[in-house]
Amino acid sequence: MPEIDALFESINVRDLLAGHDLNDPTTPLSAPDLRLLINRLESHSLRIKSKVQSYLVAHHSDFSELFSLCQDTVSRTRLISDDVSDVLQLVSDRPIDVEIRSVVDEITEKTKEVKLKRESLDLVNAIVGICEALQETKEALKNGRFRFAAERIRELKVVLRIGEEEDGEPVAYALLRKEWSNCFDEIQEVLAKFMENAVRFELDSSRIRIKYQLSVGETAGIALSTVLEAMEVIGILDYGLAKAADSIFKHVITPAVTHASTFAAVEDLCKSAGEVTEATLRLEQSSDHKFEDVDGDAMYSGILKVVKFICSSLCFGNVTWIHSFGRLTWPRISELIISKFLSKVVPEDASKLADFQKIIERTSQFEAALKELNFVSSSDAESRLSKYAEDVEVHFASRKKIEILAKARNLLLQCNFTIPQDIAMRNAKHIVCLLFSSERCVVSEAASQLMNLVHKTLEDVCVSSARVASEFYNAARDSILLYEAVVPVKLEKQLDGLNEAAVLLHNDCLYLFEEILGLAFEYRASFPSSIKEYAVFADIAPRFKLMAEEVLQKQVHLVISSLREAIDSADGFQNTHQIKQFKSAEFSIDQVVFSLKNVHMIWEPVLRPKTYKQSMCAVLESVFRRIARDILLLDDMAADETFELQKLIYLMLKNLSSVLDSVRSADETSRPLDDIIPSLRKTRKLAELLDMPLMSITSAWESGELFRCNFTRTEVQDFIKAIFTDSPLRKECLWRIDEVNQ
């Protein structure tokens, strides 16, 4: 009704109040405005009613048709509702759906029963068939029809799914599998007995016999080929041939390798009625038994003859059978050839490596012949014999490396680390020149021989191929490192005490340190280019330098500790004016002197002069400093006591004259001993102070003489207080000493 729609859209309240400002929402409408609005809305309402009435009158027929159609639709809906109600009433009175469901369930159950019975029948038929097949197999086995029995065993293995068992299978299947297993074991045992009967080795006549017509128990006239075919069918070829392969390897192949020069194999065939019934291989003494098989030609020829006999007489040229026999024997044959022949003909000298080429060629030809016979698989990429022979340089170098390391280890273990008293022998074997310091040094025989071995090995590196040179280089490094690993452990007990072995170890390490540093300069230029890239020795040199210092420092520490214990027995040199205390102090000094002389006797002949001087000075400094300190710590000394103390000091210095002279002679600078051993000057001065007047002591301090002797102000003052009684003069002297700035 477009007209009605247009009428409603034409109503606009704003137009009805056109005279009023409606833009301002806060402006209220007045009573006249509202009355005007009501009047105008009533007018519009009348107009709308008039329009609607006019529209209905104009479309009366259309509205009549619409109402009639609606009435017909309602009537039909009522009829359909009545029909549906009737159907529902009918269904509720007779439940046909329940009857249909019951029939369907019954049909399903019967179908399942029929299917189950059919499956059970099929299972029974299958079980009966398998049982009959197993029985036929047993009968065939008894009658000697091995090929038929073997094929049945193979078929039944598939049917019974041997090795593929599943949970929930019928119990009958488990029983049938057990029966099949028993049948398989039986045929395997029977075939093995026939094979054992077929191949025999007679020790007395040294021959191997292969029979072609076999019999075991009541079963006779079985062909060897039939037995082999049956074993192949059921997959026990390796098992069946294992015993024969072991016998042939032990009694035929092994002599062919170990006694190749005295071995000869002669093949013979035995015929009956035109058929070959037996093949024989006899081992005879070779007429050329005095000939030495240098290049392995006789050995390879003998083995090849045996293999050909096996391929033709035992395996009948069947590739599968030959492969099986080869798998069983070739690994052992190759290992035997390597251990008994190839490893023993590896050259012992690098110059003889070229002569080994003939053996390499003959070995390659031998393996190629075996591959041609299918004895060795052509896909076997190992070619273990050829590879071993071609790698002879590596084997040679490996063996030489083992020999070098064994020699190095033996000389280190056998050396007793002592120096003979015979000077001539010492000069000949134990004195070496240090490479960088140009000093002569006494070393152990082990160190000198070890470096001789290293030098010889590195000389071989310079003239060897890359692979050999690499092994020799590693052997040289490892030989040096063996010293570090072996000697300290061997001398472990000696290193815990004062002895010649410890200082020899120090010298050895120093000598090895300088020698190792010089190795690269001496040989690296002549090394093969591949070795130059990584050939270094400087990385292992510092550890020997460090070891030398540690050993020497430990010796010095042990000596100083021993001397301190000896000095401790003097009880601080107290009361030496008493006979008992004096004897104790004197014994302590004698012990110190004896120990120092013993150290002198051990160190001086072995250590370098410079090292001897430094070490002995450290020891003497410790002794003199300790004795001077103990005496200066005395807080009260009688006149007789100072005399006895002075006597002890002079006695000690006199008895140590030889030791002090050795230090003086070892010093290249010719400096006074007092400068080399500061506490020696202090000890000597202390002996003078013990009988010096008070004023002289004071003057000596004021002049700086005592300060230059390493006395401190406190030591001088305490010394004066200990010797001299309290008096104005002592106070004055102490004051004067205190006033001097030094």
From Swiss-Prot:
It is a peripheral membrane protein. Interacts (via the central region) with MAG2. Forms a complex with MAG2, MIP2 and MIP3 on the endoplasmic reticulum. The gene is ZW10. The lineage of its organism: Eukaryota, Viridiplantae, Streptophyta, Embryophyta, Tracheophyta. It is found in: Cytoplasm, Cytoskeleton, Spindle; Cytoplasm; Chromosome, Centromere; Chromosome, Centromere, Kinetochore. This is Centromere/kinetochore protein zw10 homolog. Disruption phenotype: Accumulation of the precursors of the two major storage proteins albumin 2S and globulin 12S in dry seeds. It comes from Arabidopsis thaliana. Keywords: Cell cycle, Cell division, Centromere, Chromosome, Cytoplasm, Cytoskeleton, Endoplasmic reticulum, Kinetochore, Membrane, Mitosis, Protein transport, Transport. GO terms for cellular component: endoplasmic reticulum membrane; kinetochore; nucleus; spindle. May be required for accurate chromosome segregation. Required for proper maturation of seed storage proteins. Forms a complex with MAG2, MIP2 and MIP3 on the endoplasmic reticulum that may be responsible for efficient transport of seed storage proteins. InterPro entries: Zw10/DSL1_C_sf, ZW10_C, ZW10_C_2, Zw10_middle, Zw10_N.
